[in-house]
Swiss-Prot record:
Protein name: Spindle pole body component 110
Family: Belongs to the SPC110 family.
Main subcellular location of this protein, as a coarse class: nucleus
Keywords, sorted A to Z: Coiled coil, Cytoplasm, Cytoskeleton, Nucleus
Region entry Disordered, spans: 1-66
Gene field: SPC110
Length: 929
């Protein structure tokens, strides 16, 4: 059609445009008639009136492609992909539809492939994303190989390269640590590598050496298994040693606590010894006082009753001393239990503090990790759609984030429970501390009161003994009895502890002082009486008898007073005994509770210590057993290695030579690596230059496209102008425009070819660089490379498959279109033949009246819509010319856009297929010609 259009430019409008696409069959009931059979319009009458020859006028517009006479069916575009069913086709095309090679009956995955506009939009989006990915890859390669910073717009979207460098640094640190851990087993690995090199040499020397290969593989498998087992055992040993160290630390801390308790017990024992010595001294003093009292009792024959009371008082003193000693022992025990409880509480607090610190540190670490992961996640949101590997990493990071969030929630819940427990325990500890402090203070006060009372009793007893020594005379027995009563009162007042009886004791003391004063007065009177008796024995016997009677009366009165005082003292003693009994019962119950609690805690601690010791013993035994087992394994392996080495000692020299050769080769490879790095630097520079050139070419392409658009517009204008004018000058201008268009097309094609060649060169360089990178990368990324290669193969075969399906669909549609054209052409020829027969038979109409009969008798179905013979006519040129419909123009534009997009997509698909084919070939280390 293009060839015919170039030959006959004026008849271009007569051609109908039928875009390639899927056609839905519809029966056109109102089919258009032949234009020659239509009646003559008013324009023909106007021409007859003007005495001009009549012109044939078409009934319908030639530009109306939808209501074309070429087809009986209406043209429609289907936006969906064709479902290649036989039942959907008409009965006329059954023979065509039967031959469906390389087609699928129902292709529903590529359901949008038949809609050219949607397909082109999707392909454009895919191509833009692929172009963007390729640019990112080129820039990443530049940064990795030459540390070249990108100064363009892609710099914003290359944040993940920094993450790659960080992961590289992390990998290097982890690799260094792993190498340090592997130093212990390097000797065995070197020996096995030597054996492997020997096996390789034997393989190269001997053709059929399958047994050695099998043995080598077995040895390698054994070595790998042993290395894995050794690694796992090392991990187990590390964990066990850590547990042992932790338990030893706990035991050491417990031993330190025990030492502290022992030291505290020693100090308490020393204090007890000092107290016992003081008690012994007091006992000696008491014995001395008792001896003195006995001597006084011997001297005082009349004071038998008072002596028995004094003995009772001494027994009471002994009982109180024994009670004091018991209370002191109880105090010591309570102090010991209090110290033990303190140490235990301190240990528990330390343990809880350590656990809290560990948990807090873990929480801080997790917070830092979460912040890093969130920053990484935010940075990777930008480059999610760029690469499949990044998607997988992002999914993994999402899973890790979900796991970390769940762990954080668990740790937060545990921390809450732990803090609640700590708060409860701290409250319990505070309560127990307060109770313990109150009990200790009460015991201290009680002991201080008892000690003060003892001191008072001792001092009072000493004073009274001195008074008794001074009063050795026989006639002062009654006064000594009074003094003994006062001693009894004072000893009983010692037992009163509380403040209620202090006032009564003070009253008794005042009364005793008054009695003592009375006694002193009576003694003075007795002395005076003695003197008077000595002086007046002879003369004043009667007076003395009277005085003696008066004195006897006074003595009787004093005795009555002493009896009253004794009754008061007895009542006070009863009250004090009751209070003492109550206090004893209270403190004994408290002491029993404390002792029971301390015993329970001791039992618990002993059980824990026993369990820890048993666990330690079991761990030590298991470790010893494991160590012996692995020692035996190591010894067996060493024996096997020694046997293998003894078998192959002869080949060590050759192995050493080959090792030296390999080292030399390694040095050469290092030199080559340095040269390759330099080449990479040059390549990166070339890449940067090529990118700049590509941008320049893009600018030139844009300019060329703009020039082409301008030229096409001018060409269309000139075309319209030439159609109106039809002069030779216009033909000359058209030729010039054609020449200019051809020049522009050649320039455009040359620029396009250069751009495509440079793109292919860049792709090849990219493949080479990826190959070099894959060679330089460690073995840990082999799985990722394998996954990438598999993905490339999947994309390659998918593209091939879709291209085949599309080509088959296009061929099918073209075949249907050509069949329709043939059918329409045959119908047209038949109608023309019938018309010729009718015109040959007609003789009514005379054609001689009309000039230029060749024009009217022409049967060209694609005749021009405009007759240039009427250019110089007086009436308007555009009267009988029909204007183009918007529908036809829109369909033409739509078809052009679709064809352009399909062509671009086809070209990009071919480039993508070639690129993937070369990449797969490079990954497989083979060359496809």
């Amino acid at each position: 059609m293009d060839h015919t259009g170039e030959q006959n430019i004026q008849s271009v409008k007569s051609y109908e445009f039928t875009p390639i696409g899927y056609i839905k069959e519809k029966q056109n009931n109102g089919a258009s008639k032949r234009p020659n059979e239509s009646p003559i319009k008013e324009s023909m009458q106007d021409t007859f009136r003007n005495e001009s020859p009549p012109r044939k006028v078409r009934r319908t517009s030639i530009d109306d492609a939808m209501n074309s006479r070429m087809f009986n069916d209406s043209m429609q575009f289907d936006d969906t992909l064709p479902e290649l069913d036989v039942n959907l086709q008409s009965s006329k095309l059954t023979s065509i539809n039967m031959n469906k090679k390389n087609l699928i009956k129902e292709l529903k995955e590529n359901s949008n492939a038949s809609n050219p506009l949607k397909e082109q939009q999707e392909q454009l989006s895919k191509l833009t994303t692929e172009n963007y990915n390729l640019k990112l890859k080129c820039n990443s390669l530049l940064k990795v190989l030459n540390n070249v910073t990108d100064q363009g717009e892609l710099r914003k979207s290359l944040e993940f390269l920094d993450e790659i460098e960080e992961w590289k640094s992390k990998y290097s640190t982890a690799n260094s640590e792993f190498n340090l851990l592997k130093i212990k087993y390097d000797d065995l690995v070197i020996k096995f590598r030597n054996l492997e090199s020997k096996v390789d040499e034997q393989e190269s020397e001997v053709e059929d050496h399958t047994r050695c290969i099998i043995e080598r593989d077995n040895l390698q498998n054994k070595i790998d298994k042993l290395s894995e087992e050794l690694g796992t055992l090392n991990d187990k040993l590390d964990t066990i040693t850590k547990e042992l160290i932790a338990k030893d630390e706990l035991i050491a801390s417990n031993e330190e606590d025990i030492k502290q308790l022992n030291s505290h017990i020693d100090t308490l024992k020393n204090t007890i010894r000092g107290l016992e010595e003081t008690i012994i001294e007091k006992d000696d003093n008491l014995k001395k006082q008792k001896d003195e009292i006995k001597t006084l009792n011997n001297n005082l024959n009349d004071s038998d009753h008072l002596g028995s009371e004094f003995l009772l008082l001494q027994n009471k003193l002994k009982e109180k001393n024994s009670q004091i000693s018991v209370l002191e022992n109880n105090l010591i025990d309570s102090k010991n239990t209090a110290t033990e409880l303190k140490t235990r509480l301190e240990n528990l607090q330390k343990e809880y503090d350590d656990k809290l610190r560990e948990k807090i540190n873990q929480i801080h670490k997790l917070d830092d990790n979460i912040k890093q992961l969130k920053s990484e996640r935010d940075s990777k949101y930008v480059s999610l759609d760029t690469n499949d590997k990044v998607r997988k990493d992002f999914e993994r990071m999402r899973e890790n984030n979900a796991n970390l969030d769940s762990k954080l929630s668990q740790i937060s819940n545990e921390n809450k429970l732990f803090r609640d427990k700590i708060s409860k325990l701290s409250n319990q500890l505070d309560d127990t501390k307060r109770e313990r402090d109150n009990q200790v203070e009460l015991m201290k006060r009680r002991i201080d009161e008892i000690i003060t009372n003892n001191n008072r009793e001792n001092s009072i007893a000493a004073d009274k003994s001195e008074e008794i020594r001074e009063k050795q005379e026989a006639h002062i027995n009654e006064l000594q009895r009074k003094l003994n009563d006062t001693l009894k009162v004072q000893t009983l007042s010692i037992s009163t502890v509380e403040d209620k009886f202090k006032a009564e004791i003070l009253k008794t003391k005042k009364e005793l002082e008054e009695n003592a004063q009375k006694l002193q007065k009576s003694e003075e009177l007795v002395k005076e009486l003695k003197r008077q008796v000595i002086e007046n024995t002879t003369n004043a016997s009667e007076r003395n008898s009277k005085r003696l009677e008066t004195k006897d009366k006074e003595i009787n009165l004093l005795k009555n007073d002493i009896i009253e005082l004794k009754n008061k003292i007895n009542s006070l003693e009863k009250d004090s005994k009751l209070e003492d009994n109550n206090l004893r019962e209270y403190y004994t119950n408290k002491i029993r509770q404390i002792e029971e609690e301390s015993l329970n805690e001791k039992v618990k601690l002993e059980r824990e210590i026993f369990m820890l010791k048993s666990e330690r013993d079991t761990l030590i035994e298991s470790n010893k057993h494991d160590i012996n087992f692995w020692k035996s394994k190591c010894n067996s392996l060493e024996k096997q290695n020694e046997a293998l080495l003894s078998q192959e000692n002869e080949g060590f020299s050759s192995v050493n030579l080959k090792l030296n050769q390999r080292l030399k080769e390694l040095d050469e490879l290092l030199n080559q690596n340095n040269t390759l790095k330099k080449d990479n630097m040059e390549l990166t520079r070339k890449l940067s230059k090529s990118q700049i050139l590509n941008e320049e070419y893009k600018v030139e392409l844009r300019k060329a496209v703009a020039d082409l658009d301008m030229a096409t517009k001018e060409y269309q204008k000139s075309k319209d102008f030439t159609k109106i004018r039809g002069s030779d000058d216009s033909n000359f201008e058209l030729d010039n425009m054609r020449k200019n268009l051809l020049i522009m097309k050649t320039k455009y094609n040359n620029i396009k070819k250069d751009y495509l060649t440079k793109l292919s060169e860049l792709q090849e360089e990219n493949l080479q660089l990826e190959k070099k990178l894959s060679m330089n990368q460690p073995t840990s990324r082999s799985s990722d490379n394998a996954a990438a290669v598999q993905q490339d193969r999947i994309d390659y075969y998918r593209l091939k498959y879709h291209n085949e399906v599309k080509s088959n669909n296009d061929l099918k549609v073209m075949n249907e279109y050509l069949n329709r054209v043939l059918m329409a052409g045959s119908q047209q020829i038949r109608l023309d033949l019938l018309k010729l027969k009718e015109e040959m038979n007609l003789n009514d109409y005379n054609y001689s009246n009309f000039p230029n009969r060749d024009y009217y008798n022409s049967r060209n179905p694609y005749e021009s819509a405009y007759d240039f013979r009427f250019v110089n006519n007086s009436h308007n040129i555009f009267e009988n010319r029909h204007r183009k419909k918007f529908k036809t123009i829109a369909l033409l534009v739509k078809a052009c856009v679709r064809m352009k997009n399909t062509a671009i997509k086809r070209r990009w698909d071919e480039q993508r297929i070639n690129y993937l084919q070369r990449k797969i070939a490079v990954d497989d280390n083979r060359i496809t010609w």
